[in-house]
Amino acid sequence: MTAYDLKIEHGTVITMDGRRRILKDGAVAIKGDRIAAVDKTATLAGQPAARTIDATGRLVLPGLVSAHCHNVQALARGLGDDVPVELWTYGRIYPYETLLTEEDAYWSTLLNCAEMIRTGTTCHADPGGYVMDGVGRALTDCGIRGIFAWAGMDDFPKGYEPPADFPGRKTTEATLAANARLVKRWHKTANDRVRVSYGLRIEPNVSDELFQGVKAYADRDETLVQFHCLLLGLSEAVKQRVGMSTVQWMAGLGVLGPNWLLVHMSDTSDSDVVIVKTHDVKVAHNPGASMHSTYGAASKGKFPEMLERGVTVGLGCDSTAANNSLDMFRAMYQVATVHKEVRLQPDLIRPEKALEMATIDGARALGWEADIGSLEPGKRADVIVVDTRRTNWTPMHDFSIVANLVYAGEGADVETTIVDGRILMENRRLLTIDVDKVLTEGQRIAERIVRQLPYQETMRPRWPIA
């Protein structure tokens, strides 16, 4: 009779528990979908498992949590490079999303998830789109953990109008109904591995009534609201219209609370930070997207101040059309370096905080901290094994374990990815996704969409291709 289904032993275990313990020659034991024990390998040696993984020379840590990621935009990689955010949003991505089918969304999501699983992300928050049943199907099939939404909008002022046939262009009532249907269909399915939140697309396109509506619906259904907020290049439109920042506007409406996840938050004032902390609002920081698309998160944002005040800030990669990488190791490096460069303060965000943002703080941002984000008995078995027997990790000392992970680690170092006790990748081989088929279908669909896009003149190589 075996005590466990799976035991990972002889690794350096970064628990991310309340004491932030790191166990040399440690082990993680899994029974079903839960972590059963975390201890020294010698302590668990007399308790057999159905199978074991030898993690000698490897780190064992919680699966990474991406607090912001667009599944339906995986096939838009390359369509939004080097343009202002207004053009990116209304001129590039909205026309792309107008052409998507549910089947397109399914393959786009599998492509997205394959990249995440391969780089150690086990859970992600997707703020949504308009063909989200395809997303729900793909998350269910591939085994990753995620929460997604309908990207709500109901107000279309001059200069901030999506295409006439844009599928998100709905009334307040129709928007709320569309999101509520997704909640009813997908929320807490697949053993509570798939969840649905409410979503708001972008600040110029949201009315008072929609703010109040999503808050009421999210409270009723006990879920989150995801919202792109205070995004430099778009936040000015709200200031001109209502005479205050979007966060101040929302506070005045009485809608803010701990189930809000505000994304980007780059055009942020000190008073906005106080409001966010006062209402226990959660924040998703996407440094790679900000640097790629000049959102101003480091140059104008207040992320060090948020962290200083104790605001829960998760870390994300955004979409492959906005970053264009889903590697959370890369995101950890970015958040640990870009702010200290801008502020000229070398210890501003230490690697330990970057790892917290990618694990336990990300779980808190998504309302999932009771189940994931750390390796502790009783929590869901979302675990990754990282190979440190590589040139970019050597030498490594006890004092540099976390620093090496953040400053030198890469998603390609992830060897094994486990969600709910199920191995999704082992020895770098994906077990739940047919990668060759996903690549073929993804390329085929993307080429079809590109042929239909209205901005053909912008999609020409800058260098000659023979």
Residue ranges and their predicted role:
Residues 11, 28, 33, 57, ...:
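Divalent metal-coordination and catalytic microenvironments
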Residues 77-144, 175-191, 443-445, 451:
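Alpha-helical scaffold segments that flank or form the walls of functional sites
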Residues 75-107, 150-170, 232-257, 279-282, ...:
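Active-site gating loops and adjacent loop-to-helix segments of metal-dependent hydrolytic enzymes
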Residues 1-26, 30-36, 41, 46, ...:
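Active-site microenvironment of metallo-dependent hydrolases
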Residues 252-259, 304-395, 406-408:
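His/Asp/Glu-enriched, well-ordered alpha-helical/loop segment
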Residues 233-246, 271-278, 294-306, 322-340, ...:
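Histidine/acidic-residue-rich catalytic or RNA/ligand-binding cores of hydrolases
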Residues 137-273:
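Metal-coordinating catalytic core of metallo-dependent amide/deamination hydrolases
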